[in-house]
A protein has these predicted regions:
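Glycine-/small-residue-enriched transmembrane alpha-helix faces in small-molecule transporters
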Residues: 1-28, 134-163, 182, 285-303
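Hydrophobic/small/kink-forming positions within alpha-helical transmembrane segments
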Residues: 9, 13, 40, 64-69, ...
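Hydrophobic alpha-helical transmembrane segments of multi-pass integral membrane proteins
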Residues: 26-41, 62, 113-123, 142-149, ...
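Specific alpha-helical transmembrane segments that line the substrate/conduction pathway
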Residues: 26-37, 67, 72-109, 114, ...
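Helix-helix packing/entry segments at the starts of transmembrane helices
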Residues: 28-30, 86-93, 159-181, 211-250
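C-terminal-most transmembrane helix of multi-pass membrane proteins
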Residues: 31-33, 130-131, 202, 238-303
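Hydrophobic transmembrane alpha-helices of multi-pass small-molecule transport proteins
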Residues: 39, 61, 92-93, 110-132, ...
Length: 303
């Protein structure tokens, strides 16, 4: 997951360069299509011919829509309004939002530290946006709203994918990518310049995004969602602003104000506290389950 976070942090910079030649939708399509081919080859090499159950197809389609299409559509379009480093700080709210979803929809408990962590995440985001208030009316407000749309989409994807834990991660990643490729292809291909006109640098961008961002990325994230769950997986997004900020400064010559840097640190630190406490709650829950199971076995033996 750490390697994935670093590569996805650099992906923002790569995508921004890619959008000089392709529209966000077209870039997203070639990224997903390339990833589909690569994961498909891996699936064939493993001789994995497994399919998705008919009853799970609606969930699979929803995963493709929210995780592969809408999330990156929001992300890429937000880049046209916001610097990469600023965008990733806002997306650092993903873990806290994940805990909120768990509490509201799944009635999973949250202790005081988690609640305070979420509040500090919100404060950190307010610092980031507040420092940018002078130019919000110039269009950045739209960028922030689109970024929050990405946060919602990614959390929906995380919980939907976690519900399909019975499938092999590589197989599930392939079917999600294939489904997304089919869904987005009509619009993307219609508005895309012919591949014969692509520059050498654009081909390298597509290769990176297809191999690392899509193929490797989704195989890892699907596996992580299966093993450690949605909220623990989401915490790793808190470290993307660091990678993205460095890459943005080096390759795009972007900069952040002191207040935005402080806000970013608050978001990352608070998100880390949230996930650590969430992990403690999950571990204590597992211990309780083990104790109850042992007691049940003891009673059965006595009977």
């Amino acid at each position: 997951m750490i390697i994935l976070v670093i590569s996805w942090g650099f992906d923002y910079v790569v995508a921004k360069f890619g959008m000089y030649d392709l529209t966000p939708t077209s870039l997203l399509f070639v990224r997903i299509a390339a990833g589909t081919v690569i994961v498909g080859i891996i699936k064939v090499i493993r001789r994995d011919w497994s399919l998705i159950d008919k009853r799970d197809i609606p969930v699979l389609i929803a995963c493709a829509i929210f995780g592969q299409i809408l999330y990156f559509e929001c992300e890429y379009n937000a880049m046209t309004y916001l610097p990469v480093s600023l965008l990733t700080i806002v997306l650092g709210f993903v873990p806290a939002f994940s805990v909120i979803i768990e509490r509201v929809f799944f009635k999973r408990r949250a202790n005081r530290k988690i609640v305070f962590g979420i509040l500090f995440c919100i404060i950190g985001i307010a610092f980031v946006i507040g420092a940018d208030f002078s130019i919000i009316l110039e269009g950045r407000l739209v960028g922030y709203l689109i970024a929050f749309g990405a946060i919602i989409c990614w959390n929906v994807y995380n919980f939907l994918t976690a519900s399909l834990e019975k499938y092999d991660p590589i197989s599930l990643a392939f079917w999600q990518l294939l489904c997304a490729s089919v869904l987005i292809s009509p619009i993307a291909i219609h508005n895309m310049i012919p591949p014969t006109q692509w520059s050498g640098s654009l081909w390298l961008i597509i290769l990176y995004m297809g191999v690392i961002s899509s193929a490797y990325g989704y195989m890892v994230i699907v596996y992580a969602l299966k093993v450690i769950g949605p909220t623990p997986s989401a915490v790793y997004s808190d470290f993307m602003p660091v990678t993205a900020a460095i890459c943005g400064a080096v390759f795009l010559h972007e900069s952040l104000s002191p207040l935005q840097i402080i806000g970013g640190i608050i978001v990352i630190a608070a998100g880390f506290v949230v996930i650590r406490e969430k992990g403690n709650l999950m571990n204590s829950g597992r211990v309780c389950d083990i104790i109850l199971s042992d007691k049940q076995h003891t009673l059965e033996r006595k009977e």
